[in-house]
Amino acid sequence: MQIGRVRGTVVSSQKEPSMVGVKFLLLQLIDEAGQPLPQYEVAADGVGAGLDEWVLFSRGSAARQVAGSEKRPVDAVVIGIIDTVSVDNRPLYSKKDQYR
């Protein structure tokens, strides 16, 4: 699993039929210090994540084990919305503090 921040959505009007109705998110990867990396990933949204939320996502074969993704050609799926992240007992991110 990896941590990313939702930076936007990706819309595709023409796609593989099994992907119809799937919401795609543009994720910016986050490093161990909580800083954004210059790397992005498009992921199917499995949890209803919104703009600027920090999320957990899985890639590769793990992404295809998520319910509903088994028969879809996905490489990445958002599997959780993060509430808090701590490193060495220090808070790194808190969803409730995000909008202060």
From Swiss-Prot:
Pfam families: EutN_CcmL
Domain notes: The tight homopentamer forms a pore with an opening of about 4 Angstroms in diameter which opens into a wider tunnel at the base of the truncated pyramid. The pore is positively charged.
Residue ranges the record marks as coiled coil: none
Record's keyword annotation contains Repeat: no
UniProt entry tagged with the keyword Acetylation: no
Domain BMV: 1-83
Domain of life (superkingdom): Bacteria
Family affiliation: Belongs to the CcmL/EutN family. CcmL subfamily.
UniProt xrefs under Gene3D superfamilies: EutN/Ccml
Keywords: Bacterial microcompartment, Carbon dioxide fixation, Carboxysome, Photosynthesis
Reported function: Probably forms vertices in the carboxysome, a polyhedral inclusion where RuBisCO (ribulose bisphosphate carboxylase, rbcL-rbcS) is sequestered. Has been modeled to induce curvature upon insertion into an otherwise flat hexagonal molecular layer of CcmK subunits.
Subcellular location: Carboxysome
Primary subcellular site in the record, as a coarse category: other
One annotated GO molecular function: structural constituent of carboxysome shell
InterPro entries assigned to the protein according to its UniProt record, in alphabetical order: CcmL, EutN_CcmL, EutN_CcmL_sf
Identification of the protein by name: Carboxysome shell vertex protein CcmL
GO CC annotation: carboxysome
Biological process (GO), any one: photosynthesis
Oligomeric and partner information: Homopentamer. Interacts with full-length CcmM.
